[in-house]
């Protein structure tokens, strides 16, 4: 009997695939089975690099969805642009040696990760404007000043305390005004899929909130373990294609 057979926990850890960009994209799209998705989400919570990859994927999905809904943008992306997005995603994946399927997750170099995310955003910005790339750039209307310098804002956080989150469990979920998108069960299922949860996941509590002056809906669902709750602040139009995720956290049930 092998050491892995004697130690089920070690065998399970060895059998888990590395947290690659492709695997995390499948998680985000709801393509994994329930058991695998739960294991991956649990590993992501303790892996800052995997969390960084998921944030980059979410940003790209939001940017591309926003461009598709904006009439100011040109026609649909050309195949070459789509290929560029795929190449940028692959560039964020670390090289691995053959036969390492059961090894620990390969290290994602921070510089390469950041460069890949930046490339994704740059490619997303190019969608719909391929026909005008040869046009001369407009001259600046005024010299660059300190007013044009932007600074990074801290990541949004869930504005409710743990007791407030737990209190939502005792009330009927409120998805916003009647007729709102998330009031439709099929739309909620799509939203949960975009968050990486199966359609059977129950919503234990919900409430409209504002985060950084942006409207959102707070969703409380079971976490990966029975003693915890997963809390997500998503856009009112949340769907599998674009969750509009603004913030998330995990709180203990008791």
From Swiss-Prot:
Membrane topology, Extracellular segments: 134-254
Transmembrane regions: 113-133
Localization, UniProt: Cell membrane
One cellular-component annotation, GO: plasma membrane
Superkingdom of origin: Bacteria
Keywords in alphabetical order: Cell membrane, Membrane, Transcription, Transcription regulation, Transmembrane, Transmembrane helix
Residue ranges, Cytoplasmic side: 1-112
PTM annotation: Probably cleaved within the membrane by Rip1 near the cytoplasmic membrane interface.
Subunit structure: Interacts with ECF RNA polymerase sigma factor SigM; this should inhibit the interaction of SigM with the RNA polymerase catalytic core.
Domain comment quoted from the record: The cytosolic domain interacts with sigma factor SigM.
UniProt function note: An anti-sigma factor for extracytoplasmic function (ECF) sigma factor SigM. ECF sigma factors are held in an inactive form by an anti-sigma factor until released by regulated intramembrane proteolysis (RIP). RIP occurs when an extracytoplasmic signal triggers a concerted proteolytic cascade to transmit information and elicit cellular responses.
Name this polypeptide is given: Anti-sigma-M factor RsmA
UniProt source species: Mycobacterium tuberculosis (strain ATCC 35801 / TMC 107 / Erdman)
Gene coding for it: rsmA
